[in-house]
Each structure stands twice: as structure tokens, then as C-alpha cells.
Amino acid sequence: MRTEYCGQLNLSHVGQSVTLCGWVNRRRDLGGLIFIDMRDREGIVQVFFDPDHKAAFEQASELRNEFCIQITGTVRARPDSQINKDMSTGEVEIFANTLNIINRSEPLPLDSNQINSEEQRLKYRYLDLRRPEMADRLKSRAKITSFVRRFMDDHGFLDIETPMLTKATPEGARDYLVPSRVHKGKFYALPQSPQLFKQLLMMSGFDRYYQIVKCFRDEDLRADRQPEFTQIDVETSFMSADQVREVMEKLVRELWQETKGVDLGDFPVMTFAEAMRRYGSDKPDLRNPLELVDVASLVKDVEFKVFSGPANDAKGRVAALRVPGGAQLSRKQIDEYGQFVGIYGAKGLAWLKVNDRAAGLEGVQSPIAKFLSSEVLDAILVATQAESGDILFFGADSYKIVTDAMGALRLKVGRDLELTRLGTWAPLWVVDFPMFEDDSEGGLTAMHHPFTAPKDMSPEQLAAAPTTAIANAYDMVINGYEVGGGSVRIHRTEMQQTVFGILGITEDEQREKFGFLLDALKFGTPPHAGLAFGLDRLVMLLTGTDNIRDVIAFPKTTAAACLMTDAPSFANPASLQELSISVVAKKGTTDAGAEENQ
């Protein structure tokens, strides 16, 4: 039906007859001529209709925005005075000979001249995707996945599919369950990741695997998360953690060079402990120059118990955040920051303005200055490298509250005061995570997942001191986003059983949930390691949006709903009966749908 795409026409096509298919982006009548901007997936070109071609001209008078049309015409060079440098096709236009109105359009429920609500955009997603900026993001996504496949193929990785219907295994989030009609009362689970299957592929001898795969997690959503998401999943045998990181860093560096023309350079490597200490986050945004400085040792003996209490508590922390030029902040702004850190459990935010660095106590302004001696103040100013015109913020509480609150404050202040270097890239690797962390019930949970190997520990040593164990794990972080994470896996049965035991999984539960894995580990399992990238998040970064829904064709809302199809919906009662499932409404509700499905 077409010979060319609208957005690909240029001066090399002048004089040629072309047939185009697409949509009317805009129509205007000027001096007896009808002009339209015609759009397809590759861009927009100007088409004009002359009364000398009567049939086409009369039809063109009927055109409205978003009519689907086909035109045939001759490519002409625009006069110099009419060249549109804002369009890739701005040097040419099409003199239309024939017009075929393929399909008419009703007035759109989305207004291209104003900002539409996200709910409206998601409800009419097929129309929202016609917008050039949305189409460009999906085209970029296609190019990115194509590049990844070429890279992985060139480096000897095999693209192998793993099952979508599998067994529920604890991986940190709730599973999406699928009932079995054949096996009454039993359920499949949609995979949270292909983790165990890719490990089994290593045991099968496929020493370099990758897959661009859908994953599913029933968890509370944020702007950068979806219930179904896409991973670039990778696993290797006979490669160390350093070697895996080297290949994956090469992939990302070449991807940035290909898509952005940017050389990211070698990625710095930072331990988890250093990242938390300096930046209050295990995914630090290094574009932001602000850092936390521990000052507990300097305030242990001050009379201000808000400081001295945590400073003398092994589980406490006192940290300062120096903000260059921050002395200009108003009291109202400072109070707002105090309210902000309260979100993270902080009971307040102490502050100190350095008006004159050389004047000691006389040169600072702060409600806490009266509790500080000249010696303590000078030690704090030296430790934080404070200068005249700066402000210091202090967090003092438990280690977790201070780290979380001051880390979040660091990011907010960096944005508010325009200290964060927007338009730049700051990648790094974070390594040496704790193997375990405390859970809400007083036990331990795996910080990554229960198949991660510890660094330099035997099963006996791990069982004796699990909270001291360091995981052989690594995360790739770019501009404060964790874009990928991986680890060296456990490849011996005894170590895997030890980890399960530390996590409170009984031997019977181990056999029930992971018997197939424990059996496989007995048969010459090679050492193996891997990593998974969040494709959606990578595309989000590369296309310059901060909303992951912008890079997914048909995303869900933060309530895990599809406004376009109205999913999830109530099931047909006959289908539920066939599955031997009964849906019961909660007490106190009058859910008609649930009653229908009982």
C-alpha cells in the first residue's frame, strides 16, 4: 500500500512519485490550497492538495485530525523561504495527485494541545501511542533489545527460553498464581525470575545463557515498577564475579555508545558499606556531590543528648551533610526539610549555618551551637570541610533511620538546589553486600536471594556466624537507579542446605520446595554466576523519562490494573467451577462480582 515512510523523505526523493499511508496530524487551508501534516511511525511530512486535481482536493476538504489515509503524489523541494528546519522532512513536500480515505476518526478523547491525565492516557493507550514522543520511546526500546541480542550472540551466549508456568518458590515477593484445571486444587506460579531454571541450564552444560524474558511480582508498586516487567537475564559457568561484571559492563558501555554517543568510561567499584556510609543508599546517585560524614566520635561527650545518645550507642549513628552555599536557606525551607526526614523516621533535623568560618562559635548560627565547644565545632567543620556560606544538617538516631533519612535528604537537597549534575551519567558497581538482613519477625532473610554464595566462608563458618557473611553479589547502578543485579551462585548441596536452614526453611520444606534443585546440585554442578538487567529501567534511562510506564506499550497502573481492558476482572462462573475454585466476598462487603463467582 505504500512505497515510502513519511518521515524518511528528503531531497534525494525530489521528482519521484510516492505512495504514503498514515494519519492526518494537522490540516490547514491556505490561499485556495489544503495542507496537511501526514504522520506515520517514522515521522511527519507536509502534503498539499491543489484544486487542479479536483477529486483529491474535494476529498481533502473532508479530512480531519487522525483520519487514516493513503495518498499518492510527487515529492517537491520546498522554496527556501518555506523550509522547516524543525522537521526532518522540512526541505520537501508532497504534491498529492490522489487521496484515499481509508478510515475516518471520531473526535479524540485525548487533546494533543494540552496535558492529558495519566488515567486518560492509559485508558486510550492505543491513541496515546500515536504521539511521536511515545512512538519514539518504543522504537528506541526495539533498537535496544536488538542491540542486546546482537551483543549476546557475538559473545557466545545462547538464547534459551524457560517456562512461564512453574512452581512457586520464595524469592522475596508474592507470586501470581495460575490454577490448574487438570490437577484440581493445585496452582502454577508465574516466574518472578528464571533464576532456578537458568541455574539448571548451567548444570546442563549450556555455559552462556541469556533471555529477554517477562517476569511477574505481586508487590506494592512505585513509579519505576510494574507487576509484569522484562529482564535481560544472563547466566554463565566457569566465570568469576569479576569476569561477569567485565562482560556486562562492556554490554552497557557499548549500548550507551550506540544509543547516546556517550563513553561511560570504566565503572568505579564501591562496597555496600561505603555506599551506605557516604551516600545513605546502596544505589547512590554519584551525579550529586553531597556526602554524609560520620561525626559520632566528635560528639560523644557533648551535653546535647540528641547527639551524645546515638554517638555512644553501638547501633546508633550521628552523620552530617554539608551543603555548599546552603546558609542562604530560609528557616521555612529548613523546617520543610525537617518534615521531610520525618517520613523516614527521623525525629528532627539539627542544622548549623556557617556564616564566617574563621570566627568559630561567633561565626555560626544554630539552635545547637550552645551545646558545642569551640573545639568540637572546629572538629566538625574540619571533618565536613565546611566553608563560609555553607549549612550543615545533622541526623542522630539509630543507624538505619539516620542512613535512610540523610540519604533521602541528600538527594532532595541536591535536586532542590540544582547541585545534581543533570544531563550527565554516573555508573558504578556496588559489591560486598551483607548476605542476610533482619526480617520483621526477628529472623534473617536473604538480601538478594537464597541462591547467592557467600564470600570466602565454609558452610560451617556460615552457620556459626551468618550475620557476618558477605555475599558474592554485585549491583550495577546508573544515576541512582539499580539497573542490574547479580551474584555468584551456590553450587554445592551442603552450602545450599545451610543457607536454607539459616533462613528457617526446614528440611521437609527444602525437599518440598527445592528438591529438584538439591538433587541437581549432586551431579557435578559447575561454578556459575549471573546477572539480570531491568530492561524497562534501562530504556527509561536511555529515553530520558522518569516514569517506567512511558517505555512499556501497555502498562498497568500503580494499582496493578489495566484501564484500557479493565483487567483484572471477574472470571466466568463456569470457568471457576471447572477449576474447582470458589470466590468468597470478605465479610462486611457486598461485592456483586464476588457473589456471582461463588
Curated annotation (Swiss-Prot):
Q: Which residues bind L-aspartate?
A: 171, 217, 448, 489
**Gene Ontology biological-process annotations:** aspartyl-tRNA aminoacylation
GO molecular function ontology, one term from the record: nucleic acid binding
Question: Which SUPFAM superfamilies does this entry report, sorted A to Z?
Answer: Class II aaRS and biotin synthetases, GAD domain-like, Nucleic acid-binding proteins
Entry-linked Pfam families:
GAD, tRNA-synt_2, tRNA_anti-codon
Q: What is its EC number?
A: 6.1.1.12
> Where does the UniProt annotation place the signal sequence?
none
Q: Where does ATP bind?
A: 217-219, 226, 482, 534-537
Subcellular location(s) per record:
Cytoplasm
Catalytic activity, reaction form? tRNA(Asp) + L-aspartate + ATP = L-aspartyl-tRNA(Asp) + AMP + diphosphate
Q: Under the cellular component aspect of Gene Ontology, which terms does the record hold?
A: cytoplasm
**Which EC class does it fall in?**
ligase
Highest taxon in the source lineage:
Bacteria
Q: Which PROSITE patterns match?
A: AA_TRNA_LIGASE_II
Specify where the region named Aspartate lies, as residue ranges.
195-198
Q: Where is the major localization of this protein?
A: cytoplasm
- Alphabetized UniProt keyword annotations: Aminoacyl-tRNA synthetase, ATP-binding, Cytoplasm, Ligase, Nucleotide-binding, Protein biosynthesis
Role of this protein? Catalyzes the attachment of L-aspartate to tRNA(Asp) in a two-step reaction: L-aspartate is first activated by ATP to form Asp-AMP and then transferred to the acceptor end of tRNA(Asp).
Q: Which family does it belong to?
A: Belongs to the class-II aminoacyl-tRNA synthetase family. Type 1 subfamily.
> How does this protein assemble?
Homodimer.
Query: What is the official name of this protein in its record?
Result: Aspartate--tRNA ligase
Q: What would be the name of the gene that encodes this protein?
A: aspS
